[in-house]
Amino acid sequence: SRGLGDVYKRQQIDCFRACGLQLAQNTMAAKFSNTRQVIRRTLHDNAELRDNQEIQKVLGILHDGIENVYRAETIEEVMGIEGYCAQNYFSIFNRLITNTKVPFSFEFRTKRPPLDPVNAILSFVYTLATNEFAAALETVGLDSYIGYCHALRSGRVSLACDMVEEIRCLSLIHI
């Protein structure tokens, strides 16, 4: 019934108010850890990249990001750290694209609309993952539009966006 749905929605909102910062910190720490793992796997598989100073610098930034999110006092601070780490990750992303039959070139992240084939693939994969998460969240009774990291915005499944953060880099491994 609608009344029960409203109760669940209220519980979700109350939970995110009470522990949203901790959820954001844990989500972003996991995102940075997973991103570091993807980079290390790429380095393991591509010996010629292991001594690349820019890649090593980004690994350090992501490591520091894990520590820094737990020092953050607001979700906005956490998201600022996430933005800084993402910007640095995407600064080396082109070097991480290996073993392709078709030459891909990536300079920087663009969205709405993506301006090159790599950005189009990123946006497509992220959209698929976000839609899958939104469906799963709705199935278990959560409101996918009410998240803890991403601000509420008309039409955005903020909770699904929050959940996808942790696995974004993993969703690209086999593409």
Region locations from a protein language model:
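Active-site helix-to-loop segments that bind/position phosphate- or nucleotide-bearing substrates
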Residues: 10-172
